[in-house]
Design a protein with these regions (language model features):
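Long amphipathic alpha-helical scaffold regions
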Residues: 1-191
Length: 191
């Protein structure tokens, strides 16, 4: 049903409703009790798919209507961004999703969608969302793919602000929270 709704605004709200309805029924266990039950990987797949579809609809909104309505459309998109970001919040709330799961499935799925959407407004907002909703430990262990994705963003994206947000988020960590002490030393003494 959700894929059948082609109007971007209606589709976004329908997918947000779907996400809200499934919030308490998505599985949050690493291993299912039997082979017919679902586990956290199914939940991750569901939310990532919903995120990708919502983001496509959100990006498509910029092309709806006459060019004279561009300012109004951008304002609408700005107001709707939180609905798209809710998918990332939901992914971050999955307690069974480990660092390994984040590195292998969650972050690559998100970054692929962010980079491929080729929309500066979406890219900047979603990169900020990633920084804000996922734990510091996850960011420390995935700096390389995150920064590589920053290099692939559209020219209209303020990458400097994204990097500053990430630095501010990680700056407050204590040295024992960094697995590699040399990495902490380089970070704090290279300024």
């Amino acid at each position: 049903m959700c894929r059948g709704v082609q109007h971007p605004l209606r589709g976004i709200f329908l997918r947000n409703y779907l996400l809200q309805c499934t919030r308490n029924i998505l599985p949050d266990v690493m291993v299912a009790e039997n082979e017919h039950e679902v586990n956290v990987y199914d939940a991750i797949d569901f939310v990532l798919t919903n995120f990708a579809e919502m983001n496509k609809l959100w990006v498509r909104m910029q092309h709806q209507g006459h060019s004279s309505e561009k300012t109004r459309r951008e304002k609408e998109r700005e107001e709707l961004k939180i609905l798209v970001g809710t998918n990332l919040v939901r992914l971050s709330q999955l307690e069974s999703a480990t660092l390994e799961t984040y590195q292998r499935l969650v972050l690559p799925g998100i970054l692929e969608q962010v980079v491929s959407c080729r929309d500066a407004i979406a890219q900047e907002y979603l990169m900020e969302c990633i920084i804000q909703v996922f734990p510091d430990e996850f960011h420390l262990q995935t700096l390389d793919p995150f920064l590589k994705s920053c290099a692939q963003l559209e020219t209209g994206v303020n990458v400097k602000n994204i990097i500053i947000s990430l630095i501010e988020r990680l700056h407050c960590l204590q040295p024992e929270e960094w697995q590699d002490q040399r990495q902490w030393h380089r970070c704090h003494h290279s300024r």
